[in-house]
Amino acid sequence: MKVQASVKKICGSCKVIRRNGVIRVICSAEPRHKQRQG
C-alpha cells in the first residue's frame, strides 16, 4: 500500500473509493496499485 498526497487510477481495474473519510484506490488485477491518501 502506497501512501500518496494525490491518488489516481493507474490501470483500468483500479477503483477510487472513500472509506471513513479516507480516499483509497483498490485494484483487483494488480494489488501493487493499492494506494491511500495521507
UniProtKB/Swiss-Prot annotation:
Protein species of origin: Acinetobacter baumannii (strain AB0057)
SUPFAM superfamilies linked: Ribosomal protein L36
GO molecular function, one term: structural constituent of ribosome
Coiled-coil parts of chain: none
UniProt similarity note: Belongs to the bacterial ribosomal protein bL36 family.
Alphabetically ordered keywords of this record: Ribonucleoprotein, Ribosomal protein
GO cellular component terms, A-Z: cytoplasm; ribonucleoprotein complex; ribosome
Pfam families for this protein: Ribosomal_L36
InterPro entries: Ribosomal_bL36, Ribosomal_bL36_sp
UniProt protein name: Large ribosomal subunit protein bL36
One of the GO BP terms on file: translation
PANTHER family: 50S RIBOSOMAL PROTEIN L36, CHLOROPLASTIC, LARGE RIBOSOMAL SUBUNIT PROTEIN BL36C
HAMAP family per the UniProt record, alphabetical: Ribosomal_bL36
